[in-house]
Amino acid sequence: MNFRAAGRLVLFCLKVVVTIFSYLFTAAFASKETKRLARAAWLHRNSRRHLKTFGYTEGISGEIPKRGLLISNHLSYLDILAISAVTPAVFVSKADVRRWPLFGWFAKLSGTIFIERERRLHVGEVNTEIEKALATGALVVIFPEGTSTNDETILPFRTSLLEPAARGGHEISVSWLHYELEDGDARNEVCYWGDHTFFPHLLNLLGKRSVRATLRFAKFKQITDDRKELAKQLHAAVLNLKCENEVLTADYAD
């Protein structure tokens, strides 16, 4: 562990203490009807503070959604903070995230809807929770790849959590996330995938000078109520944002 990583880890932990007090004085005592929105707002207020610990900066394009469904690619444990720093949101995440140090704690307190994919009946319960969150006017973020990747490609989207989208009646947006490191390889040192283990990965990332995120947003026009076809169309929409960014980057380099 280098000095930068050690110092930032201490700073991160101190910020966690501040965040706990912030939660106790805001979202913890919200009414049942407003608690989900209050938790999303709490994470929104605190995300940027924690991202700064990583030397984090961002570039944003497109219309930032405020409600409805947001469908995004998934790269890292930073994704929830990165999106939440831009707009208050309720996240849908795999149950494993609950066990991540610190970030799992953030996820639980912010009202994340956890899914246990090995339990087939649990998907229906999760879709019901998504509908409840949407009914409150929340923005619900889904990562339909089902896992995080190294940003080389976007995995085919799973259809199980797209039932609320297929039913219609909700605004749908798509987003694409991308990270860059000034002094490293973002695909292995920011993206959290494969055989990486959490704490060594986090310490290494804290030791980097800075992390740069790109977030691209776009509205999605739903033209089908078939989940499989919808999954393909949403995948194509997110992939299009990735390809647009690569074209812009290439043009800039020229």
Enumerate the predicted regions with their spans:
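A transmembrane-helix-recognition feature enriched in membrane-embedded lipid enzymes
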Residues: 1-59, 105-109, 208
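Catalytic core of membrane glycerolipid acyltransferases/transacylases, capturing the structured
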Residues: 19-35, 53, 66-120
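Residue-level preference for the first positions of well-ordered beta-strands
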Residues: 67-69, 112, 137-143, 171
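Generic beta-sheet signal
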Residues: 94, 115, 143, 175-177
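A cross-family acyltransferase "interaction/gating" segment
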Residues: 102-104, 152-228, 232-233, 244-248
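Catalytic-site beta-strand/loop segments enriched in glycine and acidic/polar residues
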Residues: 133-162
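Short, low-complexity, charge-dense intrinsically disordered segments
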Residues: 250-254
